[in-house]
Structure formats: C-alpha cells, structure tokens
Amino acid sequence: MIAIPAIDLREGACVQLVGGSYAAEKVRVEEPLEALKQWRRHGFRAFHVVDLDAALGKGSNADAIFQLTAYERGLTFSVGGGVRDSDRVETVLSGGAEFVVVGTRAIEDAGWLADIANRFPGRVVVAADVKGREVVTRGWTAGSHRDIREVLAAFEPLPLGGLLVTAVHKEGQLSGVDLPLMREVASTSRHRLYASGGVTTMEDLRALAAAGAYGAVIGMALYTGRLDASAVAREFAG
C-alpha cells in the first residue's frame, strides 16, 4: 500500500478541514508548493490534490494545481474537485495528472462516467464520499440517498483507475479510520481502493493495508505532526 499526502486547495492556499465542514478550517499553508516540497523531502512520490473551491462551484485553483503537477517529473498526481464535464477531464489529464478524480457527476450520471472511463481507461478515479453508509455529493453538502454498496455495483464493469472512498464522518477528526467500511469496499469491488478519512496512526495504515487498500490518503495527521511523515514514507511511500 502507498501513503498519499493530501493537498486540498482553497482560495489559493493548502488547507485541512474538520469533518468535511468548510467552516472548520484547522490548517492553512499559504503556498501549496511549499507543502509539496515538504512532503517530497520526506520521500513521498504520490499526491492527491483537491480543488475545494471548484467542488463548491465557487472558483478555481487551476494555477496552483499546474504549479504542483509541473514541479518535478516522475511524481504521481491525482487531481479532483469540481470535475463535472469532459473538457475538464481532458484538461486535468493533459495538465500533468496521472489520474482525474470525479465525484458528483460520476455518482449522478452513469452514462457520462461510462463515456469518460472508456475514453481514458485506467485514469479515471471515482470519489465515493460516505457519511454513515450514504454516498454524499456536491462537496459533501448533498445526500444521494444511495448506499455505498449500491454505488459500488454500478462501477464494477467500468475500466476505472480506482475508487477513492472517503469516510466523511472521520475526515479531519484524528479519530481513526472506518475500517469496516474500507474492508467492505475492498472485498466487494475489483477496483483499486484508495482509502481516506481519519488516518491517525501507523496502526491505521497497517490495518488499511491488511484490509486490501491500494493507497491511503492522509491529511490532518501529517499536517499537524500527529503522524511522523518520515516514518510513514519509509514504510508506505512505495
């Protein structure tokens, strides 16, 4: 399993939110490139970038994203947040990202998801953000009334690059991962699982690896120093 630092962008800065609430910003790094450089010094090579403003339809951090993806050859970026049309998918993938992460429209429009997945096989990652068992959309602000297992079943035939499953109720809480949820996804789906939400300790990472996760996205625990970044990178940087 690989550990993947999160770089969440808001108003041009790198931030961390508690519980998926845009009113609960706990960490802010004014220059996202400095965050990337910090994680590179520890040895990380894969990064998950989210444009929080675009996710809410309130702007874009496209310039900051390009700075990140252009920084160094050989790094792997997954980029998401507000990717709701095919032109944006193409822009992200041609701009240096290995994977594009699609959430809201992928959940709401199966035909569109099938189209982009087949146009870009292995490069589309679907974000399934989960509160309890319900998949939520629109920057975690809207419910879909669909259970995670129902949503997973719809993705099985598609040539996806993976599933990014975020336990929103654990996000930024430093309270541990939702291991039953991640075990269920790993055992139910044939796609690579990228687990997110609540990673706090090395034991959390080892448990996710044992559960079958391909990758773990880590945010708050790295930014606050709760996790030793060097130790994580030594064991899980890939």
Curated annotation (Swiss-Prot):
It comes from the Bacteria. It catalyses: 1-(5-phospho-beta-D-ribosyl)-5-[(5-phospho-beta-D-ribosylamino)methylideneamino]imidazole-4-carboxamide = 5-[(5-phospho-1-deoxy-D-ribulos-1-ylimino)methylamino]-1-(5-phospho-beta-D-ribosyl)imidazole-4-carboxamide. Coiled coil: none annotated. GO terms for cellular component: cytoplasm. The active site is at D8, D129. Keywords: Amino-acid biosynthesis, Cytoplasm, Histidine biosynthesis, Isomerase. Belongs to the HisA/HisF family. This is 1-(5-phosphoribosyl)-5-[(5-phosphoribosylamino)methylideneamino] imidazole-4-carboxamide isomerase. It comes from Myxococcus xanthus (strain DK1622).
